[in-house]
Design a protein with these regions (language model features):
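Phosphate/dinucleotide-binding and metal-coordinating scaffold of catalytic cores
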Residues: 3-339, 343-426
């Protein structure tokens, strides 16, 4: 029964087996090495432990606070039947074949996730993230020291047998040395790029730190002088400008700066889920919050944030900001505003009915022009702005963005020309 259900109470085991309470208790005692006792009193359940690719089925959960202190806040248990039992900060989450919303940041994804999959391939982990089982997701999380958010899985002082992913490299303060360091780091990453990444529109990234310990995420272009390199050069400059525009209009964004070398262009963003050298804040995507607390099917940022505000889990002001940024994105050609591209802060004291706060905006750029394997770096072409977005408060911000881009001396003539057309259409 437990091998199929994963988790059951004594009464449920009695009903499914037809055995008495005494018999069930005796059988459970005989399996004490494999059966986990989870919960207290009436909430007590029994689960059949399933190892995490040879590692213990039960792993500690730590919450890293803003000062960098690790506090043990719970235990994660992987059970037979792909059931996950999580006791976290006094709350219990039970899911099947998936992480609960609050642990979603532990799930490797995107470009950095694919690099991690390659790093772990010798351990038998699938190279395709889309094929990862819950066991693979947890195994990978146990090998990462710097996952997004404030929750860490596994003992921080005891690296797992395959070894934790390498420590973050430090970047020099001055621009020339920083560019040289980034050139070397990006070259190292490029040598291990997942197949098709550079040509498939997937943005290459790496993690690093400034000399003072500030954590940064770095996007970088393919080599300059190539069609894809020149296109991503334009797009990264447009992203920096879009974030500057939002910030100038009172909307918090990731703090970014451009760094250039003769071979590549870099967008360096300070991580807002980190504080100083070791402090952290917990951050989940709007998609994870939707899964946890919104009954309707996911549509977009605006709808989810409006629903969270109605449920008093997000302020009306934050919901309005999310709507404004959504319309701004549509007006500047951001076709990639998926459920993982808007972050919400949450703290450990409100996990049953959390009160979210919108995080700084990131990944805001005209992705409609990103290169891909089918069309390559197609010529820039103007588009008709969404009518509803043109009627929103974001229109003025979009006009400011297009004017600034049309006058920029850091992007190509093609991008300046299409930006000028968009000034007239917005």
């Amino acid at each position: 029964t437990l091998s199929v259900r994963g988790l059951a109470s004594s009464k449920e085991l009695q009903e499914s087996t037809g055995k008495s309470q005494a018999t069930v208790s005796r059988l459970l005692a005989q399996l004490s090495g494999r059966v986990l006792v989870l919960g207290q009193g009436r909430a007590r359940r029994y689960g059949l432990a399933k190892s995490i690719r040879g590692l213990p089925a039960q792993q500690p959960l730590y919450w890293v606070d803003e000062s960098g202190r690790f506090d043990k806040v719970g235990t994660l248990s992987l059970l037979s039947g792909d059931v996950l039992h999580v006791d976290l900060a006094g709350h219990t989450f039970v899911t099947k074949a998936a992480l609960p919303w609050v642990l979603d940041p532990l799930r490797a994804q995107g470009f950095l996730g694919r690099l991690l999959a390659q790093h772990l391939s010798a351990s038998g982990v699938e190279s395709d993230l889309e094929r990862w089982t819950l066991e693979s997701i947890l195994f990978a999380a146990l090998h990462v020291q710097d996952a997004p958010g404030a929750i860490a899985l596994g003992e921080p002082a005891d690296p797992t047998p395959a070894g934790k992913v390498h420590v973050l490299p430090d970047l020099a303060d001055d621009a020339d040395n920083m560019a040289a360091a980034l050139d070397q780091l990006s070259l190292n990453v490029a040598k291990t790029l997942p197949a098709g990444s550079s040509a498939g529109g997937e943005q290459p990234k790496l993690l690093a730190r400034y000399a003072d310990g500030t954590h940064v995420l770095v996007k970088f272009t393919p080599p300059r002088g190539t069609a894809f390199g020149e296109r991503w050069h334009d797009l990264l400059h447009a992203e920096c400008l879009a974030l500057d525009t939002l910030r100038a209009h009172g909307i918090a964004t990731a703090t970014t700066k451009m760094v250039s070398s003769p071979t590549r262009t870099y967008l360096v963003s300070e991580r807002f889920d980190r504080l100083g050298a070791s402090g952290r804040r917990h951050l989940v995507s709007v998609g994870a919050a939707h899964t946890g607390f919104v009954a309707d099917a996911y549509q977009n940022w605006t709808n989810t944030c409006a629903q969270l505000a109605t449920q008093q889990q997000l302020s009306k002001d934050d919901a309005s900001k999310a709507e404004a940024v959504w319309h701004f994105g549509r007006l500047i050609g951001n076709t990639d505003m998926h459920s993982g591209n808007l972050g919400l802060f949450v703290d450990s004291r409100t996990l049953v009915r959390p009160r979210f706060r919108i995080a700084p905006i990131y990944d805001m750029l005209p992705m409609r022009w990103r290169p891909d394997m089918v069309s390559g770096a197609a010529d820039y072409s103007a588009f008709e702005p969404n009518t509803l977005s043109l009627q929103s408060a974001a229109r003025h911000m979009a006009q400011v963005f297009w004017r600034a881009l049309a006058e920029s001396d850091t992007v190509s003539n093609g991008m300046r020309e299409v930006a000028q057309i968009m000034v007239e259409r917005t």
